[in-house]
Every structure is written in structure tokens, then in C-alpha cells.
Amino acid sequence: RFKKIRRLGALPGLTSKRPGSGSDPKNQSRSGKRSQYRIRLEEKQKLRFHYGLTERQLLKYVHIAGKAKGSTGLVLLQLLEMRLDNILFRLGMASTIPGARQLVNHRHILVNGRIVDIPSYRCKPQDIITTKDKQRSKALIQNYIASSPHEELPNHLTIDPIQYKGLVNQIIDSKWIGLKIN
């Protein structure tokens, strides 16, 4: 995991660790300039590793984004940001996206009062995301919320930390996407 971060730069969804200053790939001499192919491949890999997608899943999202109206890149990022695992990460209910996937897979999360165990579930505006009423589920989320640094919450989400409840207000705005993509 850390090799990927060193190679591609900071991936906030994968881990909170940052590459050290001694491992800066820009300081090392590379032969020749970066080709267009290499730049596109690195950006694709950033998306894959940040959101925890397989190649096939990413291709499906690209296909859906290509059919939609508007900028394909922007629509693709909106689709990826509206996944349930990513919304849990943005709400601070999980420290990383893989941690959020585990919460969903282990059936700790309810969307609109129904258990959802699919991390790629596409959330819609006005969806209410809560934890199961079990003590263990609430304890897991409570630990994540207490230990996570309180970053500014995106406009499209609201959280009630006392009831362990999150609300999707609208589709994400492009300025809140935390990943820098060329």
C-alpha cells in the first residue's frame, strides 16, 4: 500500500499516511519526459486505488459517465463520490475507504432504514445513512468519529454525531472532491 502512495502521491482514501520527504519521486532523476500514456495510466491508477475499485468496476463507471450529459470526467467523479463506502469515509464514520467497505460488508450500515451490504451502493439525495441499533455497530462508529480529525464536511453531506446519522443533501460539487486528477 505504501509503495502505491509513494508512486502516485497522497491517496487520502487509502490511508492517512503521507510519503516522507526522502521518498519524493520528483527529486529522483528520471530518463526522458513523461509520455501522455504514462500520465493517463497514473491518473487512472490514482482513481482505482483511492476508491478501491477493480479495473472492470472503473470501466463500468467510465461507460456510465460517457453516456451521461455533461463533462465525462466530472460525472465520473460524481458517480464515484456518491458510492456508499465513500460517503461513509467523507462523513468521518470510517478512517479509510477500505474501512468503510468493511463496515458495509459486515452489515453495520442502514440506508433509509434498510440494511445495505454492498459498498458500491449508489446513494441518492435525501438518503439517510445510519448505524444498526446494535451496541457493537454504534461503538465502531463512535470510535471512528471520536478518533478522526474533524475536517470540514462537504456541502452535500450533513452528520449528526450523537445519533450516528448522516444525510446526503445533494449530488457532490466538484470543489469538494479531495483527489487531484489531471
From Swiss-Prot:
Q: Where is the S4 RNA-binding domain?
A: 82-143
Xref: PROSITE patterns? RIBOSOMAL_S4 (PS00632), S4 (PS50889)
Q: InterPro entries given for it?
A: Ribosomal_uS4, Ribosomal_uS4_bac-type, Ribosomal_uS4_CS, Ribosomal_uS4_N, S4_RNA-bd, S4_RNA-bd_sf
Q: Name one GO molecular function term.
A: structural constituent of ribosome
**Xref: SUPFAM superfamilies:** Alpha-L RNA-binding motif
- Gene Ontology BP annotations: ribosomal small subunit biogenesis; translation
**One GO cellular component term noted in the UniProt record for this chain:** chloroplast
Please name one Pfam family that this protein belongs to: S4
What keywords are assigned to this protein?
A: Chloroplast, Plastid, Ribonucleoprotein, Ribosomal protein, RNA-binding, rRNA-binding
Instruction: List localization entries.
Output: Plastid, Chloroplast
The parts of the chain that form a coiled coil are none
Where is the stretch described as Disordered? 12-36
Q: Give the intrachain disulfide bonds.
A: none
Functional description taken from the UniProt entry: One of the primary rRNA binding proteins, it binds directly to 16S rRNA where it nucleates assembly of the body of the 30S subunit. With S5 and S12 plays an important role in translational accuracy.
UniProt lists the family membership as follows: Belongs to the universal ribosomal protein uS4 family.
* Subunit note: Part of the 30S ribosomal subunit. Contacts protein S5. The interaction surface between S4 and S5 is involved in control of translational fidelity.
Q: What is this protein called?
A: Small ribosomal subunit protein uS4c
Q: Which organism is it from?
A: Dietes grandiflora (Wild iris)
The upper taxonomy is: Eukaryota, Viridiplantae, Streptophyta, Embryophyta, Tracheophyta
